[in-house]
Amino acid sequence: MATVDLEKLRMSGAGKAIGVLTSGGDAQGMNAAVRAVTRMGIYVGAKVFLIYEGYEGLVEGGENIKPANWLSVSNIIQLGGTIIGSARCKAFTTREGRLAAAYNLLQHGITNLCVIGGDGSLTGANIFRNEWGSLLEELVKEGKISESTAQNYAHLSIAGLVGSIDNDFCGTDMTIGTDSALHRIMEVIDAITTTAQSHQRTFVLEVMGRHCGYLALVSALASGADWLFIPEAPPEDGWENFMCERLGETRSRGSRLNIIIIAEGAIDRHGKPISSSYVKDLVVQRLGFDTRVTVLGHVQRGGTPSAFDRVLSSKMGMEAVMALLEATPDTPACVVSLSGNQSVRLPLMECVQVTKDVQKAMDEKRFDEAIQLRGRSFENNWKIYKLLAHQKVSKEKSNFSLAILNVGAPAAGMNAAVRSAVRTGISEGHTVYVVHDGFEGLAKGQVQEVGWHDVAGWLGRGGSMLGTKRTLPKPHLEAIVENLRTYNIHALLVIGGFEAYEGVLQLVEARGRYEELCIVMCVIPATISNNVPGTDFSLGSDTAVNAAMESCDRIKQSASGTKRRVFIVETMGGYCGYLATVTGIAVGADAAYVFEDPFNIHDLKANVEHMTEKMKTDIQRGLVLRNEKCHEHYTTEFLYNLYSSEGRGVFDCRTNVLGHLQQGGAPTPFDRNYGTKLGVKAMLWMSEKLRDVYRKGRVFANAPDSACVIGLRKKVVAFSSVTELKKETDFEHRMPREQWWLNLRLMLKMLAHYRISMADYVSGELEHVTRRTLSIDKGF
C-alpha cells in the first residue's frame, strides 16, 4: 500500500484537468461517485469538468462540458440515477465521433477522463485512449489545433468505475448499483409474499441482469425461493418434472406460497431461452396452482441508493482521482475495483477480457467454467444456493444434539441465521433445539426441539423470533450446566452481539469446573454496533446503517427546506463508532464524532467555525453525527448548546436521537444473505468438529479451537478461537482494539471539505486479474 505525502498530494493535481462522465444504463450510486471524483479532484488542486449526457455530450461538446465547483455536487448523494445524464452513443463508436470528442476535450485542456459505466463504456474509453496520439495528429493536419497543443496534451489517462446494476464485470466483487437493485428486488418480494400467502399462489418473478444471473441468484438466496433459473447454470434436461415435483412437495409440507425467480437471460442446456410465461403455463398445466408472473423491469434501476452503494461509490471515486494523478504514459487504463473491503486498481482490458471469456464459455456450453470466471463471490453464492436448495430432512440420525440461541440486543439477520443453521443441522441428521430468551432461557429450561417447517418464512423477518436477552451466563452457570445435561446438548450456536462473545468466553473459562461445558461452541456476531472481535462485519450492522441513513436523509431534507439549520444526530453503537462513521459518509455529514478518533475543544471550535463559513455559501444546512458514547463530557446536549450559542445569528440548531429505529425493519439483502451463509458455514463447521472430538460414545472438546467466532475477515470467512481473540479485545469499552474502518474517516472529512493531514491516505495498488484471484476456496 502506498502512503501519500500530504503537501505533495494537496498540489499534485495543480495544472491538471479531469473530466467525469456517466455512460450506458444508469445505476444508483453514480451520483455519489460523481460527487467523490469532483470533490477529490478539487481537493488536490485540479480543475474538474462535468460532461453531460455521457459520450454523446463528449462528441457534441459546447454546453455539455461544464466546469464544476465544490457546490455543483452538493446534496446529490441520496439521489438515484445520474444528475449529469447518461446516453448510449452511436457516434462515439465511429472514428469521426472520437475525433470530435478529442477536439472538445482539448478545448478545455482535459487529459484525464473518469468514466462511470458498464463494460461497453469502459472498452470505448480504452479505444479512445489508444487512438489519442493519432487523433491529435489528424487534428493538427486539419489545422484545428497547433503542434504545441498536441505536444502539451500528448497523453490521455483513463480511470474507470463500474456502474451497472447487473454486477457482470469481472475483477470487482460488487459494481455500483448492484446492492441498491437488490434492495428494490427484496422490497418487491416482501410485498408479493404477503399477497401470495393470502391466496396460496405461486409467483414467477423475472429480474434484470442481461446475460448475468447475479441479481437472480442473490435474491433467490435472500428470499428462500423454491426454484431459480440463471444463464450461467442452465437446468438439466427434464427439469420441468423436477421443478413441479419440488413445488408440489413444499405445498404438501404446509407452505402457502411458491416463489420462482428467473433471470431475464435464462436458457436451457441447449441455449434455448426459458421465458417466465413458459414457466407459468407449465405450473398451471401440471399442478393447477394459481400462478402469476411479475416482471420487475426498470423498478430495479430506480430509487435511492443503499448505504453500501453510497460508500462504495465515494471510496471508488476518490481512488479513481488518485489513479489519474499517479498515471504515466506507460500505465495501462485502469478500473477501480472492490476486493473484500479494500479498493484496488486493475488493468481495464484484463477485466474486459475475462468478462468476454465468461460469455464465450457460456456460448460454448462450458457452464462450470463460466461460474468460476464470474468470480469468488458468485461461485460461493452458487455453492450455498445449491446446498440449501437440495437440503432434505436426513433419513439417518446422528448421535448429536445442538442448541441455538440469540444473545444481546435484536439485530436484523438473526432469524436468517437461525433458519439456515436449523435446516443445515437437520439435513446433517442432528437433533436441533432452539432456546428462547438467551442464556437466561437456557438456565430456565426454555428449550424446544425444532423441525424443518418451524423456521419457514423466517428469512425476511427483522428482530429476533427466538427472543433475546443481554444476560451473561456466569450468574446462572449451575442451571445452564444442568439443562445442557438434561437435553444432552453437544454443541451451542450463539447468535448475538458482544454479550454472545463474552458469554461463550465465560463458558469456556468454566470448562475446568464443569465437564458438560466441554462441548463445541460457535458465535455468529450479530449486532448493529459492529463491535465484536473476529469479524469485519457483524450481522445487522448493514440494516442499521441503512435505517440511520434513511432517517438522516429526511432530516437533511427538513434542514434544506428550513435554511440555515444544523441538525445534531445521535446514533447508537455503544463506544464503537462504526455506525456514526459509515452513516456519516452515506449521508454526506459535516462531521461524525466517535470515541476511537479522540477530539478536544479545539476540534469542536474548528467544526463550528467550518459550519459558520459553510452557511455563507449556497448550502445553508448542516448535519453532525455523534456516537452515543463518543465522549463522557461532550454529550449531545453539550454539542447542541455549543453549536446554538456559537452559531447565534448565523444558524439555528436542532437535535435528534435516532434510538431503536436503527435496529431496522426488514433485514437488507446483505444481512439476509450474510446470515444465511454464516448459519450454514457455522453448522457445517460444528458438525465436523463434533465428529473430530467424538470418542467412545461421548463428546469431549476442550481445545481452544473448539469455541470460535465465525466472521468475514477481508476476503475470507474465518473461524477465530475466543480465547485467542481475548488479546484483541478492549473489554472496558466492549470492542476490538483494532478497527479496520478507521481509514474511512479520512474520506468523510475530505468530502466534507476539511483541510486535514492526508499522510494516512492509503491508495490502492495496481493488481492483475488472474483466474487464481477470481476463485478462492473460502470466502463469499
Swiss-Prot record:
Gene: Pfkl
Active-site annotation: 166
Family: Belongs to the phosphofructokinase type A (PFKA) family. ATP-dependent PFK group I subfamily. Eukaryotic two domain clade 'E' sub-subfamily.
Protein name in the entry: ATP-dependent 6-phosphofructokinase, liver type
Subcellular locations according to the entry: Cytoplasm
Keyword presence, Nucleotide-binding: yes
Residues annotated for substrate binding in this entry: 164-166, 201, 208-210, 264, 292, 298-301
Molecular function terms, GO-annotated: 6-phosphofructokinase activity; ATP binding; fructose binding; fructose-2,6-bisphosphate 2-phosphatase activity; fructose-6-phosphate binding; identical protein binding; kinase binding; metal ion binding
Function according to Swiss-Prot or TrEMBL: Catalyzes the phosphorylation of D-fructose 6-phosphate to fructose 1,6-bisphosphate by ATP, the first committing step of glycolysis. Negatively regulates the phagocyte oxidative burst in response to bacterial infection by controlling cellular NADPH biosynthesis and NADPH oxidase-derived reactive oxygen species. Upon macrophage activation, drives the metabolic switch toward glycolysis, thus preventing glucose turnover that produces NADPH via pentose phosphate pathway.
Glycosylation sites: 529
NCBIfam families in the cross-refs: 6PF1K_euk
Catalytic reaction list: beta-D-fructose 6-phosphate + ATP = beta-D-fructose 1,6-bisphosphate + ADP + H(+)
GO cellular component: 6-phosphofructokinase complex; cytosol; membrane
Enzyme Commission number(s): 2.7.1.11
Domain of life: Eukaryota
Pathway assigned in UniProt: Carbohydrate degradation; glycolysis; D-glyceraldehyde 3-phosphate and glycerone phosphate from D-glucose: step 3/4
Species of the source: Rattus norvegicus
Notes on activation and inhibition: Allosterically activated by ADP, AMP, or fructose 2,6-bisphosphate, and allosterically inhibited by ATP or citrate. GlcNAcylation by OGT overcomes allosteric regulation.
Primary site of residence: cytoplasm
Cofactor(s) recorded in Swiss-Prot or TrEMBL: Mg(2+)
Positions carrying N-acetylalanine: 2
Chain residues that bind Mg(2+): 119
Post-translational modification note: GlcNAcylation at Ser-529 by OGT decreases enzyme activity, leading to redirect glucose flux through the oxidative pentose phosphate pathway. Glycosylation is stimulated by both hypoxia and glucose deprivation.
Binding site for ATP: 25, 88-89, 118-121
Lineage: Eukaryota, Metazoa, Chordata, Craniata, Vertebrata
UniProt xrefs under InterPro entries: 6-Pfructokinase_euk, ATP_PFK, PFK_vert-type, Phosphofructokinase_CS, Phosphofructokinase_dom, PKF_sf
Name of a matching Pfam family: PFK
GO biological process: canonical glycolysis; fructose 1,6-bisphosphate metabolic process; fructose 6-phosphate metabolic process; glycolytic process; glycolytic process through fructose-6-phosphate; negative regulation of insulin secretion; response to glucose
